[in-house]
Amino acid sequence: MSSASAKAQATAAVNNVLSLVLPGSAKIDHNSTKRQNNSKGSKAQLINANLKKAVRVRERDAHSIKKREQRNRRKLQRARQLAEDKVDQQAKLDILRKHREEDSLTAKERKFLNKVINKNVRDLKSWDVDAEELHELQESVLRNTSQRSSLQKRKRKQRRDDFDESKKPVSGDHRYPGLTPGLAPVGLSDEEDSDEE
């Protein structure tokens, strides 16, 4: 018994190692003692097939690694380009500021400066609108949550009141001192109609 379980564990370990080293390789069956080479082909063919599978897996992995590296390179390149553009823009603005202070702006520089100013003003106005919209959104969320919570409170109170009403007895309390429950006093009948007479 122990030798069979040990053999099964060893076979499983070998299969795990083979799957790590040669992905897609055929697993070893621990139940069969003889190899069935006739149905699968010769050992050389099996080795060749396993190597081809391993090469395909490596190529696929290499392709995905290349794609990932290309994506990272593109991200870095975009970040560098943005940083360079920002530095260039700042240098241009410094030159324009210096020319404006010296009153030596050309028509082209004045036009560019006006465009930059208009763009900055537009951006600032759009930020103000966003702040207003954000404030309105916050107010509407607060209104909705307060309405929702008050509605939930009303429903809870209504359910409690309904429960309390259903708990109350339908008829009044007809207790008389000295009598056991369910017995009427002497001279009165159990019927309610006789009370009206």
From Swiss-Prot:
Please tell me the species this chain comes from.
Lachancea thermotolerans (strain ATCC 56472 / CBS 6340 / NRRL Y-8284) (Yeast)
Q: Basic residues: which segments have biased composition?
A: 65-78
Keywords for this protein: Nucleus, Transcription, Transcription regulation
Entry function? Involved in ribosome biogenesis, probably through modulation of rDNA transcription.
Q: Which InterPro entries match?
A: Rrt14
Under Pfam families, the record lists: RRT14
Basic and acidic residues bias locations: 159-176
Q: Compositional bias (Polar residues) at which positions?
A: 34-48
Gene that codes for this?
RRT14
Q: Chief location of this protein?
A: nucleus
Gene Ontology CC, one term: nucleolus
Which family does the record claim for this protein? Belongs to the RRT14 family.
Extract the ranges annotated as region (Disordered). 25-84, 142-197
Q: Where in the cell is it found?
A: Nucleus, Nucleolus
State if Manganese is listed as a keyword. Answer: no
| Entry protein name | Regulator of rDNA transcription 14
